[in-house]
Amino acid sequence: MFSNIKDRIRLLFRKDRESYLRFYKMLGFYPKDISIYEQALLHKSLSVKSEKGRLLNNERLEFLGDAILDAVVADIVYKRFEGKREGFLTNTRSKIVQRETLNRLAIEIGLDKLIKYTARQSSHNSYMCGNAFEALVGAIYLDRGYRACKYFMEHRIIGPYINLEKISRKEVNFKSKLIEWSQKNRFEVTFELITQSHDQGYNPTFESEVLVEGISGGKGTGYSKKESQQMAARVALGKIKNDSGFIECIFAAKTARELPQEEVTVSDSKPSDSGAVTPDLSLEEIKKTDVVEQIISEAEEKAFKENA
C-alpha cells in the first residue's frame, strides 16, 4: 500500500533512525512526523510542556484515536459480514474495541514496552496499554490519514491477532462493558436487586436495576441475578449512547459528587435551583461526545467514498 523507498533513503541520514525502524516494524510503514507517535506513547504522569506552555501527553490523541478506531473497525466489519443486521455489526465492533482487547493487542505488538510513564502510575492504571493503542491510532490518522489507519488495523492487527469469525460469535458481557466505561470516565455504577419471584412454571426470576451516579440507568429481568444485571446493563449502555437527557443528568450528578465538601455545604444552604449544578462542565462533556460522533461520521463517509 505504501511506497517506502524514499523514506528508506531519508532514513540513512537520520540520527534517530532506530526509532523510525521500530515504528516501521510495528506499523508496516514509516512515520512522516515521528514526534506525533512519540507523544502517543507519553502518559499524562510524565507530561511535558510545549514551547507555548501547554502540557503534552497522549490524552488528546487517545480521544481522537478512540473515534477513528470505531470508524475503522465499523468499516472493516461492515464489509466482512455482508447481509448481517446492525445489531450484529455493533456487537462485533464492540468486542474488538473494548478495553480488554485493546490492552491485549498493545502487548502483542510490543507497545507496552514503549510507553513512558511513572513507575507508580503503572500499578494503578490497568487501561494504560489500551489507551496508548488508541493514541497510536490517533497519531497514525494525523500523520498518514484514514487509509493508513485502516491498513494498520487490517494487516497488522486483525490479520495476525483477531479471528473475526470467532469473535463475532463471542457473547457480549454488557455488565463488564458498562463497568469498563464507568471506570474509564470515573462514574459510580451500582446494581441493585429489586424483586425476586417465580414465573408460571415456578422457576425463580430476578429483576435488577443499575444506577449511574444514583440515577436509574435501566432495569432487567432474568432467570438468575447475573442475567438480570446483564439485561439492565444493556439498557443503560443504550441510554448512554442515545439518550442526551440521561447523559446530562449523570454528568450533573457526577459534578455535584466531585465538588469540594465546603462548596456542597454552602450550596445546600441556598434555595434549590433546578439545573443549576455546574452546567458549563456537563455541557462541555456533552460537546466532547458530539465531536466524537462527528469525527466518526466524517471518517466513515470518507472511507466509503474512497472504497466505492
Curated annotation (Swiss-Prot):
Originating organism:
Phocaeicola vulgatus (strain ATCC 8482 / DSM 1447 / JCM 5826 / CCUG 4940 / NBRC 14291 / NCTC 11154)
Q: Where in the cell is it found?
A: Cytoplasm
Assigned GO CC terms: cytoplasm
The EC number(s) given in the record are: 3.1.26.3
Q: Return the InterPro entries for the record.
A: dsRBD_dom (IPR014720), RNase_III (IPR011907), RNase_III_dom (IPR000999), RNase_III_sf (IPR036389)
At the top level, the lineage of the source is Bacteria
Q: Where is the active site?
A: D66, E134
Task: Name the cofactor(s) required for activity, per the record.
Answer: Mg(2+)
- Tell me the segments the record calls region Disordered: 261-281
Provide the function of this protein: Digests double-stranded RNA. Involved in the processing of primary rRNA transcript to yield the immediate precursors to the large and small rRNAs (23S and 16S). Processes some mRNAs, and tRNAs when they are encoded in the rRNA operon. Processes pre-crRNA and tracrRNA of type II CRISPR loci if present in the organism.
What is the name of the protein in this document? Ribonuclease 3
Entry's Gene Ontology BP terms: mRNA processing; regulation of gene expression; rRNA processing; tRNA processing
